[in-house]
């Protein structure tokens, strides 16, 4: 029995033994996913103006000259700027949090995370909301005083594509070799010996460099803070090109800003989610957070930048209300779960135990109160509704802005299944009792 099998036999963490197909699949993702983002870039920001059909016709007709003319160029100074952006966010992540002193109910400062499968407890400096505010104040002031243009991101978006890909792969290889040579928490490592699987899915659970947890940092700081700045740059570029900002652009920015601010306001809650509490840090997170997130999650604003859509008042209100309903479901479910962890008075739950790899039995509870008694993943249901609202704001002329809600639905359904497999291993008979009490995953009576 190899070390990986030995480790997984007593651990409720990741225990999948990859097959040849798994290794080939992860190898394909590792090598070809950047080209998917490049295609998104060409269709959304090139002369195709969001038309997948026109792009497809150029491929069929062999018009490679037109396609090639839309491929962005690489600029070394843009790579330097992207690296400085990450360093700047790293500096902000090290500052002590002060926002919790002024913002009601906000939890900031040094806080404990989730107990890892090997029994380690990691602490995080929760100051994302502070970093978000400082960054936006500095960027807005810099634009106001003319230090750089408010369209600077979109003016260099093509070069940024190449730069963040380089950075994403550099971080991936750093994480891989760090895990092999000086792991922060070796007992939580999952090394399978399958090269691409280990690189893509990650070996280390909580890699730290200079006291900073790379998983939380890259999950939240460079990409999600940039998300809103990218949207704002798209809006300013739309204004520059057309002389106004469409109400559809405003709607997308508002709905996504609500989601972004919610993420940072509830960063202390986020450290207990799947991304932080269960996933290992490899290419999937390193490249995903530096490339997939900023380019995939901003497709709506990018599409509207070149295709201004003026929504009717009725449709605007309908999409806005839909987005708010989705957000309320998402936030209420997560709030209830977080609240019930600390105060179980009047809460319906199944008391249970689980064992970590160090052999200790630990107490926990499976809650079926509130929305968690309606379905097992109502937070995901709300997330999908909100994601769909972003896309509906872009009208119905082209499919490309709808990629996001399709992707999020697939992501959250597969994540739901992974969650439940993990919970079944972790809680055993208690999980079976829970699924009998709450039989539906997303939508009561349907699924």
Curated annotation (Swiss-Prot):
GO molecular function, one term: NADP binding
Keyword field: Cholesterol biosynthesis, Cholesterol metabolism, Lipid biosynthesis, Lipid metabolism, Membrane, NADP, Oxidoreductase, Steroid biosynthesis, Steroid metabolism, Sterol biosynthesis, Sterol metabolism, Transmembrane, Transmembrane helix
GO biological-process terms attached to the record: brassinosteroid biosynthetic process; cholesterol biosynthetic process
Membrane topology, record value: Multi-pass membrane protein
Family statement drawn from the similarity comment of this UniProt entry: Belongs to the ERG4/ERG24 family.
Cited function: Catalyzes the last step of the cholesterol synthesis pathway, which transforms cholesta-5,7-dien-3beta-ol (7-dehydrocholesterol,7-DHC) into cholesterol by reducing the C7-C8 double bond of its sterol core.
PANTHER family (alphabetical): 7-DEHYDROCHOLESTEROL REDUCTASE, DELTA(14)-STEROL REDUCTASE
Name under which the protein is recorded: Probable 7-dehydrocholesterol reductase
Organism of derivation: Acanthamoeba polyphaga mimivirus
Gene field: DHCR7
